[in-house]
Each structure stands twice: as C-alpha cells, then as structure tokens.
A protein has these predicted regions:
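N-terminal glycine-rich phosphate/adenylate-binding segment common to multiple enzyme folds
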Residues: 1-35, 120
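Glycine-rich phosphate/diphosphate-binding loop of Rossmann-like nucleotide-binding domains
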Residues: 28-99, 111
C-alpha cells in the first residue's frame, strides 16, 4: 500500500438514502429514485459513529455530505451531526463535502479517523478506501443492527469455485 499508516473506519447509514428502494417509473422514458432521510436514521448512525470513536480511542469523527446541493436531505444529516457532536466534546469533529472528502481520502487517508456518511456516499467511499489500502477485495464489512448483525467476508464470494468443494464458506 502507498499508505501504510492508513487506519480509518467508515460508518455508513445502511437503510435509507437512495438505497431505500423507493423507485418508480414516471413514464415509459423516465424513472425516479427518491432519497429518504429521517431524523431517527441520521441520529442512530451518527451516534453509533461517535460511540464507536469513544469506545475505541478514536480522536476524530468526520461527516461527509453534499449539503451544499441537497440542502434538505443532506442538510438534515449534517445538522444532526453538528447537534450530536456537542455530546462528545472530547472528540474532534469536522465536515467535508463528499467530493472533496473523497479526494482527500484518496490522497491522504491518514488524515482521517472515523468517517460517517449517508448510505450511497459510504458505499462508494468504502470501496475507494479499500482500493487505496491494497484492494477492494480486502475491505471488511459489518452491518450492525440493534438485534441482528451481518458480517461480510473480505475475500469476496468466489463464484468461479462454487460447488467444487475447494473452499470453506
């Protein structure tokens, strides 16, 4: 890796945003996808990021949004971040617009500690960060719920060897 001191955690919302599954066809020639952002959803994931930082000795939480354009949806995420940050005075905070933040992760990932983002941005940024660290296939993933969690293997699904009895799932 070009960044041997890279040590960041990406916390992404995983139920809302453009991945909420709210899509429909308007006409035969046009479709629409709606971006869902709720106060409880924002608070849940942002609080998780701060609690993770606190419990793991992390010093900084960075929020990334595109609230310069999406003033209501991403604005709610950013405003919730700013409000909750006051409950964690020992943790440094900052906010970056997602395109600038992604460029900074690509250039200087060591600058980051914990990053919290809405769903789509987190999906993209986590793959960028994994590739910077060596390979998209090396990015571990955990979906943490209040009652159930799901963990994804870092090696990929290897469909080319499925059914050959050569790998331990």
């Amino acid at each position: 890796s070009k960044h041997p001191n890279m040590n960041l955690v990406i916390v992404r919302e995983n139920e809302e945003d453009l991945y909420g599954g709210i899509e429909h066809r308007l006409t035969p020639e046009s479709v629409q996808c709606l971006k869902l952002t709720t106060q409880p959803g924002c608070e849940r994931i942002i609080r998780y990021a701060f609690e993770y930082a606190r419990s793991h000795g992390r010093k900084k939480v960075t929020c990334m949004t595109k609230d310069n354009i999406m003033k209501l949806t991403d604005g709610l995420f950013h405003a919730t971040f700013d409000a909750l940050a006051k409950e964690y005075p020992e943790i440094e905070t900052d906010h970056l617009i997602i395109d600038i933040g992604t460029a900074r992760v690509a250039d200087t990932p060591e600058w980051f500690d914990v990053i919290v983002l809405p769903n789509l941005y987190g999906d993209i940024l986590s793959d960028v960060a994994a590739q910077i660290s060596g390979s998209v296939g090396l990015g571990a993933s955990a979906n943490i719920g209040t009652q159930t969690s799901m963990f994804e293997a870092i090696h990929g699904s290897a469909p080319q060897i499925a059914g050959q009895d050569v790998a331990n799932p």
